């Protein structure tokens, strides 16, 4: 399987172009490839997929195989990947994610992407809507020491 490893401000992911490759079990692949000492080593796996509603779709898996939802730095790397490899000639790219539609603005110089800006939308800061999976009793709306 062909893949690319990229990083954006230290967030490193393994990228698979699903226009060319088929990934049977992305959760398991993420776990195997992300192992730092026995795999490629990464924060997770990002699949670059076709989309019916956007230019591309991002499917992200954390190193433990769980669904990652969305990563801004990962999305920025997708912008560079799809432009530099000729999958698009647009400098404004729409990207469907599990967190909704994101718009990537590519700054191109001499035919290569120099920077990518992602409109991430408004952050969610309401504590009950921010998932945290920890062992023990569920506590909402209380300060923890």
Stretches found by the model and what they are:
Residues 1-70, 75-145:
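Active-site proximal loop and beta-alpha junction motif in alpha/beta enzyme cores
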């Amino acid at each position: 399987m062909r893949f690319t490893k990229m990083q954006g401000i230290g967030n490193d992911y393994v990228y698979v172009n699903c226009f060319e490759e088929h990934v049977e079990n992305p959760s398991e692949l993420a776990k195997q490839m992300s192992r730092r000492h026995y795999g490629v080593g990464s924060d997770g796996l990002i699949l670059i997929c076709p989309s019916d509603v956007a230019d591309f779709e991002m499917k992200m898996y954390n190193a433990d195989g769980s669904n990652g939802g969305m990563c801004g730095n990962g999305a920025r790397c997708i912008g560079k990947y799809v432009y530099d490899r000729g999958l698009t000639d647009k400098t404004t790219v729409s990207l469907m994610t599990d967190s909704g539609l994101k718009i990537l603005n590519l700054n191109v110089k001499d035919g290569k992407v120099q920077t990518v800006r992602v409109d991430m939308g408004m952050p969610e800061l309401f504590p009950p809507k921010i998932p945290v999976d920890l062992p023990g009793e569920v506590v909402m709306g209380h300060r923890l020491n």
